[in-house]
């Protein structure tokens, strides 16, 4: 499978063809877990160090027949009920005054491009933060955003759900780059450690750690 088909299966509980985002093999929309839980008043978050229209994060908010339909996928943020989305910027948000940014703000969805700016957004306001990794500053967005994610989503009264993706393990696998695979895996491992620590303190949190597919055959002779 690929990230689109696997991401859709994880987000919806229904298998589909490769390259599908939130649709079945015939192109019909499938309700995702973000939509199902939001309808019950549960706070929802989608976090990734990939671009915001990457196959895995988009499977939790979009419904498109092809993973490369980046503009259409980004526009599905206008109708997604997700309370918090953090991922790297993409072409649809190339300018701060892009049409999509204006449309989101017209729907009272805040849009920011740096993680610290989230502190300026009311906890009850939906927000999209276009923040990627900054290796020059040793900034890993999935690690650095965790406490903020928990603070914002736990403000609701009916619990929360969040999907957090460490996407770059896969990117290292595609390139058969063992250093990147290990480095990104260690970053993800630190994130899981933070999540487990929170779950130990909270007592009512379920954590699932999953991979959607293997890339690069790192376990074989490609290293």
State where each predicted segment sits:
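A post-motif C-terminal structural segment
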Residues: 1-7, 54-220
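Active-site nucleophile/metal-coordination loop of metallo-enzymes that catalyze phosphate/sulfate
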Residues: 1-68, 82
């Amino acid at each position: 499978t690929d990230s689109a088909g696997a991401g859709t299966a994880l987000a919806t509980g229904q298998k589909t063809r490769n390259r599908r985002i939130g649709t079945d093999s015939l192109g019909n929309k499938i309700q995702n877990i973000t939509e199902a839980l939001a309808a019950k008043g549960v706070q929802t978050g989608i976090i990734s160090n990939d671009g915001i229209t990457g196959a895995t994060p988009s499977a939790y908010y979009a419904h498109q027949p092809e993973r490369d339909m980046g503009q259409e996928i980004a526009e599905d943020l206008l109708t997604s009920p997700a309370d918090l989305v953090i991922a790297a910027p993409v072409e649809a948000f190339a300018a701060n005054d892009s049409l999509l940014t204006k449309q989101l703000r017209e729907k009272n969805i805040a849009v920011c491009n740096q993680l610290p700016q989230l502190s300026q957004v009311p906890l009850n306001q939906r927000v999209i933060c276009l923040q990627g990794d900054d290796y020059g500053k040793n900034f890993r967005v999935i690690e650095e955003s965790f406490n903020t994610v928990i603070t914002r989503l736990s403000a609701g009264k009916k619990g929360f759900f969040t999907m957090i993706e460490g996407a770059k393990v896969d990117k290292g696998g595609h390139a058969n780059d063992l250093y990147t695979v290990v480095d990104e895996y260690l970053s993800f491992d630190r994130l899981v450690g933070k999540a487990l620590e929170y779950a130990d303190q909270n007592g009512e949190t379920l954590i699932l750690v999953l991979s959607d597919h293997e890339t690069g055959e790192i376990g074989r002779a490609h290293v």
